[in-house]
Curated annotation (Swiss-Prot):
Gene Ontology MF terms: protein-macromolecule adaptor activity
Feature: compositional bias, Low complexity: 928-949
Example GO BP: snRNA processing
Physiological role: Component of the integrator complex, a multiprotein complex that terminates RNA polymerase II (Pol II) transcription in the promoter-proximal region of genes.
Subcellular localization(s) per the UniProt record: Nucleus; Cytoplasm
This protein's UniProt keywords: Cytoplasm, Nucleus, Repeat
Domain of life: Eukaryota
InterPro entries the UniProt entry points to: ARM-like (IPR011989), ARM-type_fold (IPR016024), INTS4_8HBD (IPR056235)
Keyword match Lipid metabolism: no
Protein name, entry field: Integrator complex subunit 4
GO cellular component, one term: nucleus
Keyword RNA-binding: no
C-alpha cells in the first residue's frame, strides 16, 4: 500500500488548459497641450478694471505670436469684448488686432468675415470705422480668389463712401482699388454691374471737398490699373483738371494718372481747348507733364521730370520744344530790347509820354486760353536743369538720358545742356551728368568748345568724378585734331596733379587713340618730338606722361598702317618694352623693325581650334588613367602635369581659372601620395616626429582645399564635393599623424568621434554625388562605417591607413568656366623711395586703390593687411561704401588705411596686401549648394558645430617706406 501511494505521489499528471487570450491594456498616449491663448486673453480682459488696463493687456497680447489654429478662438474673444467695450481707444485696438490676426500665416479668415462686417453696423466712431475697414481690406487681400467675399466687401465699401469722415472715405476708396473687379467679362450679372461702375464710383470722388480723399481716389484708380483693369479714356480730362489742384499730394497723383492714360491711349486724338485743332493724347499729356516741371512743390517737379523720360512715343516736334530757351509770354516770344525798339520805330507811332509808342493799342489775350502745349513743353528741361533743388536736376538729367538714347537728333540738341551740368555745384549731379553723356556717346560728337567744358572737370577733387570723366572720354567722338591735342594736354595735367589716376588715364588714352586714328596721325611728329634732319634725345621710359603719349599713338597705329613710318628707332624699342610690361594697354602691331619671337600675342594666323583647351583635357585624362600613385614615375608625371597646367594659366588668361584649379587639385594628390610613403611610416616615432614632411603635407592640403573652395567662382556641386573629399582625406591623414606621434589612446577618442561626424556629414550633404565616387576613399569608408563605430582608436587608425593607400584617383570634371579671384594693388606704388613721415603715436592715412576680379561679396570678404617690420600685423575691414562695381565680375576698392607706430631710428618698409576672408561651417556648405539634394538634409545637421575661419592672401604684397619720427618735447 505504501509502495502504491509512493507511486501515486511521484506520478506525473498531464492536464490541458485552454486559456483565453488576455486583452492587452490600451497604451497610454502622452498628449502635450498648450495653454489656450483665447482663454488667457479672456481672463486678462475680465481682470481689467478700467479701459487703460484693458488697453495695456491688449498691447501685451499684440507682442506675442499666435498659432494659426488658435486665431479663430482669439478673434471670438476679441469680438465679444468689442461689443461690451464702451471706450473708443480699446475698440480701436481690438479692430487693429483683428487685422493683424487675419494676416497670420496658415489661417483662412473666411470664417470671420461676417463677424467683422457686423461690427460696422452700430459703430459710431469714425476712427474705429476706418480701422475696421482696414481690417476688412487685409481679409479681402487674403481672399482674392473667393469672388463672393470680394464682392461683398466691395458693397460694404460703397455703402460707407458717404461717411462724413475723410478717413473712412479713404479706406473705402482703398478697398475699392484693391478689391474691385478687374475682369473683362465677369460671369455674374451682379458682378458685371459693379465692375462696370467701379471706375465711375471712384471717379466721382476726384472732386471731393477733402484733398486727402481726392488723393485716395486717384491712387485707387492707379491701383486698379496695376491690377490689370484698363482705365477709361474719359477720365483724362478729370486728371488734367486735377493738375491745377491746390494741394501737392493731389497734383502728384494726378501727374502719374495722366502719364498712365497717355501710355494706354497714346495715339488717341484729343481737341485743343479754345481751338479747332486736334493732337495726339500722348503729345497733349507730354505738354501738361512738362508744365508741372514748373510746379511750386519740388516733389511734384521731381515726379514730373522722372515721368518725362518714359514718354518715348511723343512727337519729335514737342520733344525738341523742351530745350527751347525762348521765354514765352502769352504765346509770344519775349523779344530783346533792341528788337522791341526797332519795331516801335518802324511803326511810326508816338505818344507824349516818356516811351516811344507806349500808348499804342495792344492785342488783348485771354491768359486762361493759352495753348498748354506751347507754354508747357517749351523749355521744360531748361527749367528742370536749372531748378534750385538738386533732386529735380538729377531727375531731369536721367530723363534727358532716356529720351536721348531713343532719338539721335534730340541727343545732339541736348548735348549743350548736359555739358553745362558738368559745372553743377552738387557732386551727385555732376556725376549723373557724366554717366548720362557716356550712355548717349554713340549718338554725339563733341565740338571743341564743348570738349573744353568737359575737360575742365578734370580739376575736380573728387576721384569718382575724374574717373567717370575718363570713362566718358573712352567712348567719346571728337571732330578735329585740335580736340585730340586739347584732351591729351588736359589729361597730362591731370596726371601731373593726381598721379594716382595713372591707370585710368592710360586706359582713357588707349580708347581715345583707337577711336581717332586719322586725327592722331597728323599729331605724331609733334607728340614724339621727331625731326626730319636731326636726332632728338630719347625720352625717359619711366615718365608716366611719355607712356601716356605712347599708349595713345600705338593704339591709333593699330588702325593706321602708315603711322609706324613716322616712328624713330627708340620708339620701336619702347614699343617692345611696353608691349611686354603693359600688354593690356598696348596692342600687337606688325612693325618691320621689331623681332616677334619673344613678344606674346603677336598677330598670326589663328589656328582653326584652340589647342590649349584640348591640351588641358588631355593632361587631366593622362593623370586619371594612372593606377599606381605611389610609384616614382607616377609622382614625376604629376609634377610635370602641374608645371604644364601652371604654364597654360600664365599664357591663356581665359583658361587661367580652370588650369590653376586643376593644378591645385593635382598638387594636393601629390602631397597626399608622398605623405603616405611606407618608408616614412616605418621610421621610429622620434624620427617620424622630427621629419615634418607628413605634418606639413596635411597643413598644406587643408589650406589648398580652402583656396579651391573660396577663391574660385563658377564651381558646381560636383567640384565642391571633390574638394570636400580631398579635405576628408587630409583629416584622415591628420588623424594618422596624431596617432603616430601621441602616446596613449585617450587623446584619439575625441578626434575619432569628430572624424566620424565629418564622414556622416559628407554622406548627407553630397548624397547625390556618391554614385560618381565609386572606389574612392569615401566610398570605401562608408562601407566600413559600422566597423569603425565599434572599433578602438588604434584599430580605426590602421583601417584608415589601409583605406587611404588603396583608394583610387578621383576623376576631376570641370565646368564650362572657372574664374579665380585676383586683385592688383594700384596704390600705394612700390617704386617710391620717399618714406611717409609722421609723428610717432599719431596716425597717418595711407591711400589704397586696388582692382578686384571675380570676388564674390567683396564687402564682407576683402580685408587689408599691414605687416610692420617688428612683426606686428594690422588687419583692416574696409567700409562697404569703399567698393565700386565698374562692371560684371569686377570691383574697385578705394579706401584709406590709418597707420601708427612708435618711433624708428630709420625708415623701414611695411607690407600691404589684400586678404580674402572665409568662414566654412556645415550649415554654410549646405546653403551654398545649388542642387536641391544639398538642402534636403539640413534639418538633420547638428546645431552645435565648429566653424573654420581664416584668410587667404590673393594679391602681391606692396612694400611702402614708413618713418615715424619721435615727438618733440
Amino acid at each position: 500500500m505504501a509502495a502504491h501511494l509512493k507511486k501515486r505521489v511521484y506520478e506525473e499528471f498531464t492536464r490541458v488548459v485552454q486559456q483565453q487570450p488576455l486583452e492587452e491594456p490600451s497604451a497610454k498616449k502622452l498628449r502635450l497641450t498648450k495653454p489656450s491663448k483665447s482663454a488667457a486673453l479672456h481672463i486678462d480682459l475680465c481682470k481689467a478694471t478700467s479701459p487703460a488696463d484693458a488697453l495695456q493687456y491688449l498691447l501685451q497680447f499684440a507682442r506675442k505670436p499666435v498659432e494659426a489654429e488658435s486665431v479663430e478662438g482669439v478673434v471670438r474673444i476679441l469680438l465679444e469684448h468689442y461689443y461690451k467695450e464702451n471706450d473708443t481707444s480699446v475698440r480701436l485696438k481690438i479692430a487693429s488686432l483683428l487685422g493683424l490676426l487675419s494676416k497670420t500665416a496658415g489661417f483662412c479668415p473666411d470664417s470671420i468675415v461676417d463677424d467683422v462686417i457686423n461690427t460696422l453696423q452700430n459703430e459710431k466712431s469714425h476712427q474705429v470705422l476706418a480701422q475696421l475697414l482696414d481690417t476688412l481690406l487685409e481679409i479681402g487681400l487674403k481672399l482674392l480668389d473667393i469672388v463672393s467675399h470680394r464682392m461683398r466687401l466691395v458693397d460694404v465699401a460703397c455703402k460707407h463712401l458717404s461717411d462724413t469722415s475723410h478717413g473712412v472715405r479713404n479706406k473705402c476708396l482703398q478697398l475699392l482699388g484693391c478689391l474691385g473687379s478687374v475682369e473683362a467679362s465677369p460671369a455674374k450679372e451682379v458682378e458685371n454691374a459693379v465692375a462696370k461702375d467701379v471706375q465711375k464710383i471712384i471717379g466721382d470722388y476726384f472732386i471731393d471737398q477733402d484733398p486727402r480723399v481726392r488723393t485716395a481716389a486717384i491712387k485707387a484708380m492707379l491701383q486698379l490699373h496695376e491690377r490689370g483693369l484698363k482705365l477709361q479714356q474719359a477720365m483724362y480730362n478729370q486728371a488734367c483738371k486735377l493738375l491745377t489742384d491746390d494741394y501737392e499730394q493731389v497734383r502728384s497723383a494726378a501727374v502719374e494718372l495722366s502719364w498712365v492714360l497717355s501710355q494706354l491711349y497714346s495715339e488717341s486724338i484729343v481737341p485743343i481747348p479754345s481751338s479747332n485743332e486736334e493732337i495726339r493724347l500722348v503729345d497733349d499729356a507730354f505738354g501738361k507733364v512738362c508744365h508741372m516741371v514748373s510746379d511750386g512743390s519740388w516733389v511734384v517737379r521731381v515726379q514730373a521730370c522722372k515721368l518725362l523720360g518714359s514718354m518715348l512715343q511723343v512727337s519729335p516736334h514737342f520733344l525738341e520744344q523742351t530745350l527751347d530757351k525762348k521765354l514765352m509770354s502769352d504765346l509770344r516770344r519775349k523779344r530783346t530790347a533792341h528788337e522791341r525798339a526797332k519795331e516801335l520805330y518802324s511803326s511810326g507811332e508816338f505818344s507824349s509820354g516818356r516811351k516811344w509808342g507806349d500808348d499804342a493799342p495792344k492785342e488783348e489775350l485771354d491768359t486762361g486760353a493759352v495753348n498748354l502745349i506751347d507754354s508747357g513743353a517749351c523749355g521744360a528741361f531748361v527749367h528742370g536743369l536749372e531748378d534750385e533743388m538738386y533732386e529735380v536736376r538729377i531727375a531731369a538729367v536721367e530723363s534727358l538720358c532716356l529720351l536721348a538714347r531713343s532719338s539721335a537728333p534730340f541727343a545732339e540738341k541736348c548735348l549743350d545742356f548736359l555739358v553745362d551740368m558738368f559745372n553743377d555745384e552738387i557732386e551727385e549731379v555732376r556725376l549723373q551728368s557724366i554717366h548720362t553723356m557716356r550712355k548717349i556717346s554713340d549718338n554725339i560728337t563733341l565740338r571743341e568748345d564743348q570738349l573744353d567744358t568737359v575737360l575742365a572737370v578734370l580739376e575736380d577733387k573728387s576721384r569718382d568724378i575724374r574717373e567717370a570723366l575718363h570713362e566718358l572720354l573712352c567712348c567719346t567722338n571728337v571732330s578735329t585734331k585740335e580736340c585730340i591735342q586739347l584732351a591729351l594736354v588736359e589729361l597730362l595735367k591731370n596726371l601731373s596733379k593726381y598721379p594716382t589716376d595713372r591707370e585710368s588715364i592710360w586706359k582713357c588714352l588707349k580708347f581715345l587713340g583707337s577711336r581717332h586714328p586719322t586725327l592722331v596721325l597728323s599729331l605724331v611728329p609733334e607728340l614724339l618730338s621727331t625731326h626730319p634732319f636731326f636726332d632728338t634725345p630719347e625720352p625717359d621710359m619711366d615718365d608716366p606722361a611719355y607712356i601716356a603719349v605712347l599708349v595713345l599713338i600705338f593704339n591709333a597705329a593699330k588702325c593706321c598702317p602708315t603711322m609706324p613710318a613716322l616712328f624713330s628707332d627708340h620708339t620701336f624699342r619702347h614699343y617692345t618694352y611696353l608691349r611686354d610690361s603693359l600688354s593690356h594697354l598696348v596692342p600687337a602691331l606688325n612693325l618691320p623693325s621689331v623681332r616677334w619671337s619673344w613678344i606674346p600675342d603677336v598677330i598670326t594666323e589663328a589656328p582653326p581650334e584652340d589647342p590649349s583647351q584640348q591640351f588641358l583635357q588631355l593632361s587631366l585624362e593622362r593623370v586619371h588613367n594612372l593606377q599606381h600613385l605611389g610609384s616614382q614615375g607616377t609622382q614625376e608625371l604629376l609634377e610635370f602635369t602641374i608645371r604644364d597646367l601652371q604654364r597654360i594659366g600664365e599664357l591663356q588668361s581665359d583658361l587661367a581659372g580652370m588650369a590653376d584649379f586643376s593644378a591645385t587639385y593635382l598638387r594636393c594628390h601629390l602631397l597626399l601620395t608622398k605623405a603616405l610613403n611606407e618608408k616614412l611610416w616605418n621610421l621610429a616615432a622620434p624620427l617620424f616626429l622630427k621629419n615634418s614632411l607628413t605634418t606639413n603635407a596635411v597643413k598644406q592640403i587643408l589650406e589648398e582645399t580652402y583656396k579651391m573652395e573660396f577663391m574660385y567662382s563658377g564651381l558646381e556641386t560636383r567640384q565642391v564635393a571633390i574638394i570636400h573629399h580631398m579635405r576628408l582625406q587630409a583629416k584622415a591623414l591628420q588623424l594618422l599623424v596624431t596617432a603616430r606621434t601621441t602616446k596613449g589612446a585617450e587623446p584619439l577618442f575625441g578626434m575619432c568621434e569628430e572624424f566620424l561626424q565629418e564622414v556622416d556629414f559628407f554622406q548627407r550633404c553630397f548624397i547625390s554625388e556618391l554614385p560618381h565616387m565609386q572606389d574612392s576613399f569615401v566610398d570605401k569608408l562608408l562601407d566600413l562605417v559600422p566597423r569603425l563605430v565599434n572599433s578602438k582608436p588604434l584599430e580605426m587608425v590602421k583601417i584608415l591607413q589601409t583605406t587611404l593607400r588603396q583608394c583610387t584617383f578621383l576623376r576631376l570634371t570641370l565646368p564650362e568656366q572657372i574664374h579665380r579671384a585676383s586683385s592688383h594693388i594700384i596704390e600705394p606704388a612700390e617704386e617710391s623711395d620717399n618714406p611717409i613721415r609722421f609723428t610717432s603715436g599719431l596716425v597717418v592715412a595711407l591711400d589704397v586703390d586696388a582692382t578686384l576680379e571675380h570676388v564674390q561679396e567683396p564687402q564682407s570678404t576683402v580685408k587689408v593687411q599691414v605687416v610692420y617690420p617688428d612683426g606686428q600685423v594690422q588687419i583692416i575691414h574696409p567700409k562697404p561704401a569703399d567698393f565700386r562695381n565698374p562692371g560684371p565680375g569686377r570691383h574697385r576698392l578705394i579706401t584709406q588705411v590709418y597707420l601708427s607706430h612708435t618711433a624708428w631710428t630709420e625708415p623701414c618698409q611695411i607690407e600691404v596686401r589684400l586678404l580674402l576672408a572665409y568662414s566654412s561651417s556645415r550649415s554654410k556648405v549646405m546653403s551654398r549648394a545649388s542642387n536641391s539634394t544639398w538642402g534636403e538634409s539640413t534639418e538633420t545637421v547638428p546645431s552645435t558645430e565648429s566653424s573654420t575661419e581664416g584668410t587667404i592672401p590673393f594679391s602681391k604684397p606692396v612694400k611702402v617706406f614708413l618713418m615715424p619720427k619721435p615727438a618733440r618735447r
